[in-house]
């Protein structure tokens, strides 16, 4: 049998649609991420860093006592800055040094979140830069959202096909 070429005019005249859809799922978080830290100030840079290290070691020990695993505690920032006084009509005067150390913590047991925050503050943390809630493994939720998007897209495509008589 010979194959026939499709009618070019029919192809050109056929309506085309560009459709998009999205899918969304809502799932309760199963973990939290907190950034917390210690800021110290001393007369010398070495003293500021030593005080900071000692205080941060206490914070990390408190986290470990709360059941936070070592893999869930990560240094996320370390700063050392000179601190100056600026008297009026005079040259700036060095007051000392400020050391700051931040760690990012993953709390996988949300029932322990409040106790963990209390423990780091009691151990000497004087900076808490926010809490973010999330999923330890978001793949299943992402796949569920993708399925919902595909279903929505199929429904839209069928609606357009029916409306145009295709």
Each language-model region and where it sits:
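Short, charged, surface-exposed interaction patches
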Residues: 3-166
């Amino acid at each position: 049998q010979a194959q026939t070429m499709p009618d070019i005019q029919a192809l050109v005249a056929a309506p085309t649609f560009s459709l998009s859809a999205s899918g969304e799922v809502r799932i309760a978080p199963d973990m939290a991420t907190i950034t917390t830290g210690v800021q110290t100030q001393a007369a010398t840079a070495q003293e500021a860093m030593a005080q900071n290290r000692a205080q941060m070691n206490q914070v990390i020990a408190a986290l470990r006592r709360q059941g936070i695993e070592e893999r869930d505690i990560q240094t996320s920032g370390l700063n050392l800055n000179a601190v100056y006084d600026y008297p009026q009509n005079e040259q700036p005067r060095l007051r000392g040094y400020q050391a700051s150390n931040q760690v990012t913590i993953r709390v996988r047991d949300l029932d322990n979140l409040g106790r963990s925050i209390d423990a780091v503050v009691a151990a000497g943390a004087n900076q808490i830069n926010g809490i973010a809630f999330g999923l330890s493994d978001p793949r299943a939720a992402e796949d569920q959202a993708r399925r919902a998007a595909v279903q929505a897209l199929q429904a839209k495509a069928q609606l357009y096909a029916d409306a145009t008589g295709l």
